[in-house]
Amino acid sequence: MVRVRAVVMARDDSSGGWLPVGGGGLSQVSVCRVRGARPEGGARQGHYVIHGERLRDQKTTLECTLKPGLVYNKVNPIFHHWSLGDCKFGLTFQSPAEADEFQKSLLAALAALGRGSLTPSSSSSSSSPSQDTAETPCPLTSHVDSDSSSSHSRQETPPSAAAAPIITMESASGFGPTTPPQRRRSSAQSYPPLLPFTGIPEPSEPLAGAGGLGWGGRGYEDYRRSGPPAPLALSTCVVRFAKTGALRGAALGPPAALPAPLTEAAPPAPPARPPPGPGPSSAPAKASPEAEEAARCVHCRALFRRRADGRGGRCAEAPDPGRLLVRRLSCLWCAESLLYHCLSDAEGDFSDPCACEPGHPRPAARWAALAALSLAVPCLCCYAPLRACHWVAARCGCAGCGGRHEEAAR
């Protein structure tokens, strides 16, 4: 039915988490249908299994027979786990698309079992001992323990609905499974509406998956594919009130008595502005900074006020041709190489050659090394005046000096 690549996980109650089975590694996990022997005068029987085989050594890492009553949990878009009795398995997928494909195939198999089209091995009383051994739902008992310390509480499946799978969505903050939309609507319909308001229609179809159970809320793909933020433009809200006499012929009947302040005559409308004369037209008003639209910078991904030329204020991540020219003319790369090879920490980090902030472990050795290097490379002494000229040019708005925010392409 489906074949994906994922890492098979097992529950570890000692640490309260999930551990990879057999030291980890990608496995090829598939949901397949296994056909059994054909009884005399009957149809061919079979069952569905989840089979996992590690790619590097072809070792079986997962073998689980599907039965009604399975509890399926979707923790996040790429990690799903399920439990069947005392057996608990989990899969870490490579992408949300593969996780959704596996979930749909698993729910389709459980729906087929619930309809009774296939008879599971647990309900047949005439199966041989060899078939019982081959259809054991939890052969990996050494890697799976009972989930007694689970932080997410679940409800037992009633006997009348044992054929339908239980699907829950968990979050990192510890909230329980979401309520299906069918139950929310049934509870809302039990109370009569207070006002005959029909401005907000209900959705035509509930969000439900295979098996008749689903969940609401915003999905993972909705956040990844969300559009750009709305422009921060100011708008004026104008509310107009109709006269009381206009409601006389309405179908709702005569209007109710209004208070005295509301029944007074409306104030006269302001006089209309005269048309512009033949004289010179006035200059257009300058747009205020609040009316400028907000855009996202392509370099630092921050929001900024977009101007007419599509650029904004200063951006530390934007390319600065003037500063790059100053570094090349003053040979600043020589000082950075000296600090990296001689005065860097265990992780290879070093401070800026011209930084004067306190806290350096060896300030005397640092400045002595830079002074000795300036004797061999005299152009290092030109960095301070060139840097000052670049700062003044950036303040004055000269072209090529100072990086600016640029709008990302839509």
Swiss-Prot record:
Disulfide cysteine pairs (residue numbers): none
Bilayer topology annotation: Peripheral membrane protein
Pfam families per record: Sprouty (PF05210), WH1 (PF00568)
Keyword Membrane: yes
Changes after translation: Phosphorylated on tyrosine.
Residue stretches making up the KBD domain: 195-244
SMART domains noted in UniProt: WH1
Keyword annotations of the record: Cell membrane, Lipoprotein, Membrane, Methylation, Palmitate, Phosphoprotein, Ubl conjugation
GO biological process terms, semicolon-separated: negative regulation of epithelial to mesenchymal transition; negative regulation of ERK1 and ERK2 cascade; negative regulation of lens fiber cell differentiation; negative regulation of transforming growth factor beta receptor signaling pathway
InterPro entries: KBD, PH-like_dom_sf, SPRE_EVH1, Sprouty, WH1/EVH1_dom
GO molecular function ontology, one term from the record: protein kinase binding
Highest taxon listed in the record's lineage: Eukaryota
GO cellular component, one term: plasma membrane
Protein name per the record: Sprouty-related, EVH1 domain-containing protein 3
Organism (species): Homo sapiens
The organism's taxonomic lineage, starting at the top: Eukaryota, Metazoa, Chordata, Craniata, Vertebrata
Gene name linked to the record: SPRED3
